[in-house]
Structure formats: C-alpha cells, structure tokens
Amino acid sequence: MTTRYARHPELRLTALDGEGVALHLGTRRYYSVSESGLDLLQALETPRTLDELVAVLMAKYDVTTELATSTTREFLDHGRRTGMLSVEEDA
C-alpha cells in the first residue's frame, strides 16, 4: 500500500521572506509555516509519498536522512490534524 499526501484543495499558500502563510478557505484558519514547511507545502501541490518529501528536504538542506524523515513525519502529522493535507492510499 502506498500513502500519498497532498495539499488540501482549499488551502492557499503565500511565501513571505522564506517562510509561509497558509489559509484554509474551508475553516478560515491561518497557519504560519517555517521555511522547510513551505518547501513541503509547495512540493505537495501534487501528491507525494513520505520518501519523496524527505528527498525534497535533503536536496535543499544539509541534514541527515533521520532528521529529514522525523521533520517530515511531524509536518505530515500536523497537516493531517489541522486539515491542511489530504491523504490518499492505493494498493
């Protein structure tokens, strides 16, 4: 089973000085996101797997696989809880 993550269709993203602001139109909530969070949200314009997202961070930042993976997992968990992300699973 492959799990893919994507930005919620009602999420709007704006980049400001290396960080971002996300607005969920459905809930009318704003979220501030870090530079790495902004990178992940931009990558999630199309559905991506955890491994693909880890690769996004590793390509830009000088981090270990373990740190990139834990950072990405935390981001995905938060994104699911807040409704910023949608999750697709296929066989």
Question: PLM features: residue spans?
Answer:
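Long, charge-rich, low-complexity alpha-helical segments
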Residues: R29-A91
